[in-house]
From Swiss-Prot:
Signal peptide: none
Location(s) in or outside the cell: Cytoplasm; Nucleus
Domain Integrase catalytic as annotated: residue spans: 656-831
CDD domains linked: RNase_HI_RT_Ty1
Domain called Reverse transcriptase Ty1/copia-type: residue spans: 1353-1491
Top-rank taxon, per record: Eukaryota
Gene: TY2B-OR1
Identification of the protein by name: Transposon Ty2-OR1 Gag-Pol polyprotein
Origin organism lineage: Eukaryota, Fungi, Dikarya, Ascomycota, Saccharomycotina
Length: 1770
């Protein structure tokens, strides 16, 4: 009990005085473990200095008063007799008093007179004072124990008398025992007992007395509780309870051992090697250190040793760092081998020719202490170390052996101990004679060698002797070769054993080698260790493992020696052994070196190349080939690693072990991209191992439920149809097969799931080969038939039917025959894609045709009918009511099979199945819930975008056009039902007449460029682009080459079906002009940029036809009474609204004034445009809108296109690519990539826990994140985020209700570091939240509108922040979350009480909470239609999650709101906004400078300066600045992009990061960049080099203009009304797929508050339609902004809309209700009329060169761009 009490209170016994003493006890450069009895005086010299300077009395303490010091109560300390120590030999209190020993009190409080203490230990007096120091022993001791009669011979302790002795602290743990012993020994020394303490050898200076022994025993017992002693100490004390000195002796020995360990660690950590010494020497040094540590039970792993070695490599060896940097399984032997090879290679490179051996007389021997002075040549050998994970014995410092035995290492001889002599002649040695071998001449001191002794070498792996006198069982050597460190051969004469007879009669035997050419006889400790014999260099003895001493060893010079007297002579008389000649491999290069020098080439390749003299200066005989064929290069094994080879026919045993349908193979193929949603994207296949019967099932996704349904169906089918049970299913390791659902399904049905090994697809060959076969058939069938892609699974289904019916080359029966089924009835099969006519039993009218053209796909699974595809109805049907269409070729026509016909053959095969069309057709519905795998084909929904042609950029002279033969190619697509049969079926009638057509169109007019179409495009294009004659956007078809030459008289047009229309007479006012132009070459055209003569037709029309709507360009005030005027607002100010009042104060460019009401003909003086028509300069597609007369590239086909003519090659290369297996290269199609872009993926700006804390190398930043982490935890607990009263077990909670959590970290814009504990809402189950709830934030337009009104009305702007806003909202659902990591509750869950960040419902919950509080407690009302905008009579609030922006005329009103908020929420004032000077804000990323009554500036300079350089974009801060984000004339190449998968993902990620930041900036305030951002965003999935360069150019422009700001000035006070204006513009057909770009800019009182640039959702057919689309997009937002302005500011409002399209204005204002050109055009126009008249909207014309919305729709020249933007952003 006492020892336990002392242990608990020991840290505070000694207070500050103790700390002051121990702080000096070990100097900084002294190892604290290097303590022994011999150096204790020096060790304690400083530790007791303080004690010697302080005097204490028994009743006082020398410790300064310390509030941390707690003195234990004496009465509470029981005596130690109750412990486990034995109490024998203890003195009674009477004896103690008789011997004048003082009372032995509590150890830390003892008081004693000098040397008058008693060993007695009994209960102290409770009232006895307890000082904290012990007086030392100072008088001479009594008689020693057991030597009373020799008292005079015992040396007396003579020490300096000291006032106090610092007692040791109490032992607190078993691990601290070695440290505690140091203090205890010091305590004994200070108590004048240092001369009786044994050293590490167990030696003492004098014997201790009985009293001293009792004193040591009692103090040791008091300060070292028995239960805290190490095991080895307990074992000693259990034998002899008082043997404290033995414990101290072994402790001191362990200290010195630990000191050696520390030195070894330091040496290992500071290793350095640069090749200046031999690689063997370095290896031996390292191995010795590691072996020594291992002997001390410290194992150094190969990985750690390699890392320490690599750190110290330099010179030519430094490159090994990079080689081993990424290796995880590093072997020390491999690293040494690499170092040796580099060392050998450097040696060879320093020599001019292969070395030759010199005569032995030219060599000199050297000792260990003198360097080798010989200039011996180096000869490399086949030096290879076996790569083994087993520990190797330490190698000798001076030898290396090469043996046929695997256990003998091929080591080296150190030049310091082995002579380099070479025996030139064979000699014979008589083993029974005295040694007479010639000793080498050595340049060493005669005192270096100890005669008749063996040198003990701790690094030697073999024992070498110079004399055969001691060699037993000697045999001639023919296997072992020894070379020195210079690779010179050392002959070995014989191999035998050395027999030892040690002191105690112990005999042992070790293996030894005989050679006369060494300097010393070497004894290997490794060989001795194999016999359980070790050397103790501290006691200088050879010992057994049990501690038995066998023989002493002698230290002579620098080495340890063993006398030869322990060797037993051999007594062999005359046995002779032939000496061994030098190795045949001398002078030969090792194969590993040559293998490495020749780039790790194959063994046979190297050997053959040398035979053929392909490599000069090196012969085949110069290389050691002995082990070359079996040599394993580690680098080759890693770099050339391949999968194991599968043996052919290895699966035959499964066919013998299983019956049919018991062993199935399955695999999933997909996805197939760019298909309608109703078509499957995957299929799953099954193959029976025994019969090879195949099944395929379509899949729309790879979800668990879908896969499970298929497995249920196939198992039921096999069980019912074949009466078999599936036993094994083999599959790969895809997640669709390894999920828990499917595993449970297999387990319940007793099916064995057999998975392939990792990355071993060849083991799944049956299923993989089936998929490949089916896809090959699919591609072939679709290509041959020309059917659309969405029917791809029908082709797979047809192939499966055929493959099951045919005999494979390896089987004698088909799969159907193996399964016991009848053969395939050929009369029931039609060619895939065979044209047929299907009876329509339910026509729309009695007079409509009853037959519908279709294409046969495959026999039905569910009936005796056939699955037929009907393009006109966009669906497939299962019917028997069809007739094969005669004389209708399929795509075989393209192979010039015109002379072949299959009609007779088909009639003969299907004669008995042909019948009249009857009313028994069964139409398949997609929604039918059947098990048929063709249900997906029914009612396929296809988008109905109009067909658009693809043209080339070349312009050729019509006179040079030759008629091109037409290839009849059919691609049946969905066609309107009312189109004639000729438009649906493959037609041989193709127009061969080229067209000349104009596609140039601008709002100011254009020219018609002479061009021709490819014959394969003519008919389709004419039908699609037919227009009424005389319409403003007519395009004249020149259908005859001759008519182009002689004028436009009698022009003939061609319909789709090939019929002709009446001639169109040439207008008399139309003039044709031919011009010579420089045609702009396309990006794809690399042939020439020279001038070409191209006819440019300029058509000047003076009168328009009467069948089009009239264009009224007059504003309302100038129109006649025949025209209706829009409704005007009834207030007085509205009566004076004019175009000038609308245009007034707008930031328009300063140009020559032109009246906005100018009605002059805009088509006058139209300049001729000599360049070809292309898409937009930035983001447009080259050559997409221009007709060509040469081979044009066919764009990707859409599933909804009508019949078109395509090239077979392009069909196969582009449209079928999605059906090909995965490739190493990824092909990206521009159109598909653009259509695939849905939105810009946000780039992660936060850090995970491991990134912010665990692996963060920035300690300062790490500390800040740790601080933020603890702050977040405290806030979570403060807010009662979860229920802390109960923890729930994970197994008891529904997994759907469990939410994963994580910590995210980020650095805020103000520099503070923030941590946030969030829920993984991205994987939250849908049942745990209400999807109807919405998380609202303030719209950016609402914020900009509020800021604009604040500037005009001198409002105060206050910025607030609510800390942990979401945590104020309660959560309604029952959800559980995993605890934070610091709690350590991995298997527990917490019940959520608050809306944690990240949950789907948290945003909505917080919105409802704060909304309710603002309305009920702050008297606010939310503005209708604008979420998160609240107002009352004085204050307006814009809410963005936890940020609040307050606007008020009176600052006190803002303060009142703040006071109310603080009652409920932790509200921080970011910026109160008081004062009349300029105030700076950071509001939602916008850096705002605001001075009331004057101006407001909005920018992001600081943010962009920080973020842009981190994007890894090559910015040029000192170079020439860009003046525009892009230039006209740059075209994005539409060629497919071929790129590696990894590189593609990397570039897409880079595009997302760059465009994400640019989009954020653009929509905040840089509206001038929105066009470029929107266009590049469409190409995120097409990261070509060109797209990336344009993106870099945009980022560079943002960097150059990062200081630009959106400038607002206060509105003139004379303006009584608010004026809200939208400026609209459109660019016709300049985007991919002929889409138009539309843009709008919104201004409030002359201040730009928003902008929008986007691609039109529908394809417009003219410039006017595009402009109407742009206006229709602007009006709804204009009306919503108008409502917001009226709510926030009660002034009257004037709404205006400006456009530069006079035709659009005319259509809006016209009352003519004549039928429009098409339905879309008419509905849009009529809707605009209603919106303009119903919303009091003023529509006026703005000149194009003043239309600032022009920057939203197209790239502009630098001058124009600056002119349109410098008024509002600068």
């Amino acid at each position: 009990m006492e020892s336990q009490q002392l242990s608990q209170n020991s840290p505070t016994f000694h207070g500050s005085a103790y700390a002051s003493v121990t702080s000096k006890e070990v100097p900084s450069n002294q190892d604290p473990l290097a303590v022994s009895a011999s150096n204790l005086p020096e060790f304690d010299r400083d530790s007791t200095k303080v004690n010697s300077q302080q005097e204490t009395t028994p009743g006082t303490s020398a410790v300064p008063e310390n509030h941390h010091h707690v003195s234990p109560q004496p009465a509470s300390v029981p005596p130690p007799q109750n412990g486990q120590y034995q109490q024998h030999g203890m003195m009674t209190p009477n004896k103690a008093m008789a011997s004048n020993w003082a009372h032995y009190q509590q150890p830390s409080m003892m008081t004693c007179s000098h040397y008058q203490t008693s060993p007695a230990y009994y209960q102290p007096d409770p009232h006895y004072p307890l000082p904290q120091y012990i007086p030392p022993l100072s008088t001479s001791s009594p008689d020693p124990i057991g030597s009373q009669d020799q008292h005079s011979e015992v040396p007396q302790a003579k020490t300096k008398v000291r006032n106090n002795v610092l007692p040791p602290h109490t032992l607190t743990s078993e691990e601290n025992f070695s440290t505690w012993v140091k203090f205890y020994i010091r305590f004994l020394k200070n108590s004048n007992l240092g001369d009786i303490i044994p050293n590490d050898q167990g030696e003492i200076k004098r014997q201790m007395t009985y009293e001293e022994h009792a004193y040591i025993y009692n103090t040791f017992q008091a300060f070292a509780p028995f239960h805290l002693l190490p095991t080895w100490v307990k074992q000693i004390l259990e034998i002899n309870y008082s043997d404290i000195l033995t414990v101290l002796c072994k402790s001191v020995s362990k200290m010195q051992t630990n000191n050696q360990e520390l030195k070894d660690w330091i040496a290992l950590a500071n290793l350095e090697y640069n090749g200046s010494t031999s690689a063997d020497t370095f290896e031996i040094t390292v191995s010795t250190i590691i072996q020594r540590l291992k002997e001390n039970n410290i194992n150094v792993s190969d990985r750690l040793a390699c890392q320490l070695i690599l750190k110290g490599l330099s010179g030519d060896f430094k490159y090994l760092r990079n080689q081993y940097r990424t290796k995880t399984n590093m072997k020390l032997s491999q690293l040494f081998a690499e170092i040796q090879l580099i060392y050998d290679e450097n040696k060879i490179m320093n020599l001019n020719k292969p070395s030759q051996y010199k005569q032995h007389s030219e060599y000199k021997n050297v000792s260990r202490t003198s360097p080798n002075t010989t200039n011996t040549k180096v000869t490399t050998r086949n030096y290879h170390r076996t790569n083994s994970s087993k520990p190797r014995a330490a190698k000798a410092h001076n030898i290396a052996t090469s043996s046929k035995f695997s256990r003998v290492n091929n080591d080296h001889i150190n030049e310091s101990t082995v002579s380099s002599q070479y025996l030139s002649d064979d000699n014979e040695l008589s083993l029974g004679q005295q040694q007479k071998e010639s000793k080498p001449t050595r340049t060493i001191d005669s005192n270096d060698e100890l005669p008749d002794h063996l040198l003990i070498d701790s690094g030697a792996s073999q024992t070498l002797v110079r004399s055969a006198h001691y060699l037993h069982h000697a045999t001639p050597n023919s296997e072992i070769n020894i070379v020195d460190a210079q690779k010179q051969d050392i002959p070995i004469n014989a191999i035998g054993n050395l027999h030892f007879n040690f002191q105690n009669g112990t005999k042992t035997s070790i293996k030894a080698l005989h050679t006369p050419n060494i300097a010393y006889d070497l004894l290997s400790l490794s060989e001795l260790a194999n016999q359980n014999i070790t050397a103790c260099f501290t006691r200088n003895t050879l010992e057994r493992s049990d501690g038995t001493v066998l023989a002493p060893i002698v230290k002579h010079g620098d080495f340890y020696w063993l006398s030869k007297k322990y060797l037993i002579p051999s007594h062999i008389s005359k046995l002779t052994i032939n000496n061994v000649n030098k190795s045949k491999s001398v002078n030969k290069y090792p194969y590993p070196l040559i293998h490495r020098m020749l780039g790790h080439a194959n063994f046979r390749s190297i050997q053959k190349s040398l035979k053929k003299n392909a490599v000069t200066y090196l012969k085949e005989s110069d290389i050691e080939w002995s082990n070359a064929s079996t040599y394993q290069c580690p680098d080759c094994l890693i770099g050339k690693s391949t999968k194991h080879r599968h043996v052919k026919g290895s699966r035959l045993k499964y066919q013998e072990s299983y019956e049919p349908f018991q062993y199935l193979h399955t695999d999933i193929f997909g996805p197939v991209h760019h298909l309608p949603k109703s078509a499957p994207s995957y299929f799953i296949s099954f193959t029976d191992e025994k019969t090879r019967f195949q099944w395929v099932y379509p899949l729309h996704d790879r979800r668990e439920e879908s896969i499970l349904n298929v497995f249920t169906s196939i198992l039921a089918f096999i069980k019912n149809q074949f009466n078999a049970r599936v036993l094994v299913i083999q599959m790969d390791r895809g997640s669709e097969y390894t999920n828990k659902t499917l595993h449970k399904f297999f387990t319940n049905r007793g099916i064995t799931a057999c998975y392939t090994t990792t990355a071993d697809s060849r083991a799944h060959g049956v299923a993989e080969r089936l998929n490949r076969t089916l896809l090959n058939d699919c591609r072939t069938l679709l290509h041959c038939s020309g059917l659309p892609n969405h029917l791809w699974f029908s082709a797979v289904e047809f192939s499966t039917i055929i493959r099951n019916s045919l005999v494979s080359p390896k089987n004698d029966k088909s799969a159907r025959q193996h399964a016991g089924l009848a053969g395939l009835d050929i009369t029931t099969i039609l060619p895939f894609g065979q044209p047929v006519i299907v009876n329509n039993h339910n026509p729309d009218s009695k007079i409509h045709p009853r037959g519908i053209p279709g294409y046969a796909l495959h026999p039905s699974r569910n009936s005796y009918g056939y699955i037929i595809y009907l393009p006109s109805l966009k669906k497939t049907v299962d019917t028997t009511n069809y007739v094969i269409l005669q004389n209708k070729q399929t795509k075989l026509d393209q192979f010039d099979y015109d002379t072949l016909t299959f009609d007779d053959d088909l009639n003969r095969l299907t004669a008995h199945n042909q019948s009249f069309i009857e009313q028994n057709e069964t139409e398949q519905s997609y929604d039918q819930n059947t098990e048929s795998d063709h249900d997906y084909q029914s009612e396929i929904e296809i988008n109905s975008d109009p067909l658009v042609n693809d043209f080339s950029s070349q312009s050729l002279n019509p006179l040079q056009l030759d008629k091109e033969p037409v290839q009849k190619v059919r691609a049946p697509k969905e066609v309107d039902a009312d189109i004639s049969e000729y438009n649906i079926l493959p037609s041989t009638i193709r127009s061969r007449t080229p067209h000349i057509i104009n596609k140039e169109s601008t709002e100011m007019g254009g020219t018609i460029e002479s061009d021709t179409t490819s014959p394969r495009h003519s008919s389709t294009f004419t039908a699609r682009n037919q227009k009424r004659p005389g319409s403003p956007n007519d395009m004249i078809d020149l259908t005859s080459q001759d008519r182009v030459n002689y004028g436009l008289e009698n022009i003939k047009t061609t319909r789709l079906g090939g019929t002709e229309e009446p001639y169109i007479q040439r207008n008399s006012d139309t003039n044709i002009k031919y011009r010579t132009t420089n045609s702009t070459p396309s990006i794809d055209d690399r042939s020439s940029n020279s001038e070409s003569t191209t006819p440019i037709i300029s058509i000047e029309t003076k009168a328009a036809c009467d069948n089009t709507p009239s264009i009224d360009t007059d504003p309302p005030e100038y129109r006649s009474s025949d025209h209706a005027t829009p409704n005007i607002m009834p207030d007085k100010s509205s009566k004076n609204v004019t175009a000038d009042s609308i245009l007034d104060d707008l930031p328009l460019p300063d140009l020559t004034h032109q009246s906005p009401t100018d009605t002059s003909d805009v088509s006058k003086d139209i300049p001729h445009i000599h360049s070809r028509q292309t898409n937009s300069s930035l983001g447009g597609m080259d050559d997409s809108n221009v007709l060509t007369t040469t081979k044009s590239k066919k764009r990707s086909l859409e599933d909804n296109e009508t019949e078109i003519e395509v090239s077979r090659d392009t069909w196969n290369n582009k449209n079928m690519r999605s059906l090909e297996p995965p490739r190493s290269k990824k092909r990206i199609n521009l159109i598909a990539a653009i259509k695939g872009v849905k939105s810009i993926k946000p780039v992660r700006t936060t850090l995970r826990y491991d990134e912010a804390i665990t692996y963060n190398k920035d300690n300062k930043e790490k500390d800040r994140y740790v601080e933020a982490y603890h702050k977040e935890i405290s806030q979570l607990l403060k807010m009662n985020t979860w229920d802390t009263n109960k923890y729930y077990d994970r197994n008891d909670i529904d997994p759907k209700k469990v939410i994963n959590s994580m910590f995210i970290f980020n650095k805020k814009r103000d520099g503070t570091h923030k941590a946030r504990f969030v829920a993984r809402g991205d994987i939250q189950h849908p049942d745990t939240y209400d999807s109807d709830m919405q998380s609202n934030t303030v719209h950016h337009y609402a914020l900009m509108t509020s800021l604009s009104i604040a500037l005009d009305n001198d409002y105060y702007i206050t910025q607030l922040d609510i800390s942990s806003a979401y945590l104020y909202a309660d959560i309604k659902e029952e959800l559980y979350i995993r605890p934070p990591p610091h709690l350590g509750l991995n298997d527990k869950l917490l019940r959520l009480r608050k809306s944690l960040y990240g949950l789907k419902q948290s945003g909505a919950n917080w919105y409802e909470t704060i909304k309710s509080y603002l309305i009920n407690c702050c008297d606010m009302q939310e503005v209708r239609g604008w979420s998160c905008v609240f107002k009352n009579s004085q204050v307006t609030i814009c809410l963005f999650v936890d940020d609040m922006i307050l606007f008020s005329k009176d600052l006190n009103a803002n303060k009142k709101i703040i006071t109310t908020l603080k009652k409920q929420y932790d509200t921080k004032i970011i910026n109160l906004g008081e004062g009349d000077n300029e105030i700076q804000y950071d509001i939602l990323g916008l850096e705002i400078k605001y001075q009331r009554s004057k101006y407001m500036k909005l920018g992001m300079e600081k943010s962009l300066t920080e973020k842009l350089p981190k994007l890894n974009v090559p910015l040029n801060p000192k170079g020439k600045k860009l003046r525009a984000p892009g230039q006209p004339g740059h075209y994005i190449d539409q060629d497919e992009l071929e790129i590696d998968e990894d590189e593609y993902k990397e570039k897409v990620h880079e595009m997302q990061k760059l465009i994400g930041l640019a989009s954020y900036v653009g929509y905040k305030f840089r509206f001038d960049l929105l066009y470029y951002i929107n266009t590049l965003a469409q190409h995120i999935l097409f990261p070509s080099r060109q797209v990336l360069d344009m993106t870099y150019e945009l980022i560079q422009f943002m960097w150059d203009t990062r200081d630009k700001q959106l400038i607002w000035h206060k509105n003139k006070p004379t303006k009584p009304d608010n004026k809200l204006v939208a400026i609209s513009d459109a660019s016709y057909g300049n985007q991919p797929y002929y889409k138009s770009q539309i843009g709008n800019i919104f201004l409030l009182n002359g201040k730009v508050i928003g902008g929008k640039s986007t691609k039109a959702s529908l394809t417009c057919t003219s410039t006017t339609e595009a402009e109407i689309h742009a206006v229709s997009e602007a009006i709804p937002l204009l009306n919503n902004l108008s409502h917001l302005v009226q709510e926030l500011n009660k002034k009257p409002i004037i709404k205006g809309l400006l456009t530069d399209s006079r035709s659009t204005i005319s259509i809006i204002k016209s009352t003519n209700e004549e039928k429009f050109r098409n339905r879309f055009f008419g509905t849009k126009a009529m809707r605009l009329r209603d919106e303009v008249s119903g919303n009091n909207l003023y529509v006026y014309y703005i000149e194009t060169n003043k239309n600032i919305a022009d920057v939203m729709t197209k790239p502009l020249p630098i001058k124009t761009f600056k002119l349109l933007t410098n008024k509002w952003i600068h």
